[in-house]
UniProtKB/Swiss-Prot annotation:
One of the GO BP terms on file: mitochondrial electron transport, NADH to ubiquinone
Classification of source organism: Eukaryota, Metazoa, Chordata, Craniata, Vertebrata
Designated name of the protein: NADH-ubiquinone oxidoreductase chain 1
Reported function: Core subunit of the mitochondrial membrane respiratory chain NADH dehydrogenase (Complex I) which catalyzes electron transfer from NADH through the respiratory chain, using ubiquinone as an electron acceptor. Essential for the catalytic activity and assembly of complex I.
Keyword S-adenosyl-L-methionine: no
InterPro entries: NADH_UbQ_OxRdtase_su1/FPO, NADH_UbQ_OxRdtase_su1_CS
Reactions the enzyme catalyzes: a ubiquinone + NADH + 5 H(+)(in) = a ubiquinol + NAD(+) + 4 H(+)(out)
Keywords from the UniProt entry: Electron transport, Membrane, Mitochondrion, Mitochondrion inner membrane, NAD, Respiratory chain, Translocase, Transmembrane, Transmembrane helix, Transport, Ubiquinone
Enzyme class (EC, first level): translocase
This enzyme's EC code(s): 7.1.1.2
Pfam families attached to this UniProt entry: NADHdh
Length: 318
């Protein structure tokens, strides 16, 4: 039964990821006054299937100077970690109900750094290595902000369990009392997933394509899939933390539809930001985190710690 539930989670997530690529190309097209993909199938709806067939049917390439084991392992690890992060997410029922679900998701997102670092080093290319080092520095830096924001929300819910976060929002979204943190969280998720305007890892003018420059065919597709799975997952987590709908046993379908709609809107916002904003310089990226976000999140965290003491109250205990 567990395997059936696992497949029922993974297959729809992969289908959603495939059509997210089509959605992005359509949004980019319309923002640039063109149609986007419209040849394969009605309105281009079969384009993701054609892309997948092309990528997975091509001959895989292995650079002669690369570290072959790490080179082949890195894309598989990237996608595996991206799929693993879905397991504790309540939609409305999680695949695995962890008491420390939020901590697990934060730790798992940190593991994604290893796949990027391995791919950059194993490719034996200067462009790939510099792109990988940029990605690692950027991801680890923004995880500091993400961790502090998560700590602040945990102080409001009183538990690391994602279900208790939903219960906390029974009367109002956490977005309302903590909107500055929500804005910083959303910006940090953009940087965490290496998306524009923070896609410094694949700055075409400097690094050609970044850490995946030596990858082609199926291995490139696995990195591509992992990136888009992480985008959907991060927006699903944002929905759970800040925009959750109270879960009622009689309305699980309604909860799922509500959850999917909010996640889709946030994901569309990710894509719209890519069309609207130019890429940051690397020093601006780090300046934004260490000199703007970090002091603000620390101050807000101290505020949420001190408020219960000042009002002689404690967070709900679960």
């Amino acid at each position: 039964m567990f395997m059936v539930n696992l497949l029922l989670l993974i297959i729809p997530a992969l289908i959603a990821m495939a059509f997210l690529t089509l959605t992005e190309r359509k949004i980019l097209g319309y923002m640039q006054f063109r149609k986007g993909p419209n040849i394969v199938g009605p309105y281009g709806m079969l384009q993701p299937i054609a892309d997948a067939m092309k990528l997975f049917m091509k001959e895989p390439l292995l650079p002669t100077t690369s570290a072959s084991t790490l080179y082949m392992t890195a894309p598989t690890l990237a996608l595996s970690i991206a799929l693993l992060m879905w397991s504790p997410l309540p939609m409305p029922h999680p695949l695995i109900n962890f008491n420390l679900g939020l901590l697990f998701m934060l730790a798992t997102s940190s593991l994604a750094v290893y796949s990027i670092l391995w791919s950059g080093w194993a490719s034996n290319s200067n462009y790939a290595l510099i792109g990988a080092l940029r990605a690692v520095a950027q991801t680890i830096s923004y995880e500091v902000t993400l961790a502090i924001i998560l700590l602040s929300t945990l102080l409001m819910s009183g538990s690391f369990n994602l279900q208790s976060l939903i219960t906390t929002q029974e009367h109002s979204w956490l977005l309302l009392p903590s909107w500055p943190m929500a804005m910083m969280w959303f910006t940090s998720t953009l940087a965490e997933t290496n998306r524009a305007p923070f896609d410094l890892t694949e700055g075409e003018s400097e690094l050609v394509s970044g850490f995946n420059i030596e990858y082609a065919a199926g291995s490139f597709a696995l990195f591509f899939m992992a990136e888009y799975m992480n985008i959907i997952m991060m927006n699903a987590l944002t929905t759970t933390i800040f925009l959750a709908m109270p879960y009622n046993m009689a309305s699980s379908e309604l909860y799922t539809m509500n959850f999917m709609t909010k996640t889709l809107l946030l994901t569309t916002l990710f894509l719209w930001i890519r069309t609207a904003y130019p890429r940051f310089r690397y020093d601006q990226l780090m300046h934004l985190l260490w000199k703007k976000f970090l002091p603000l999140t620390l101050a807000l965290c101290m505020w949420y710690i001190s408020m219960p003491a000042l009002t002689s109250g404690i967070p709900p205990q679960t």
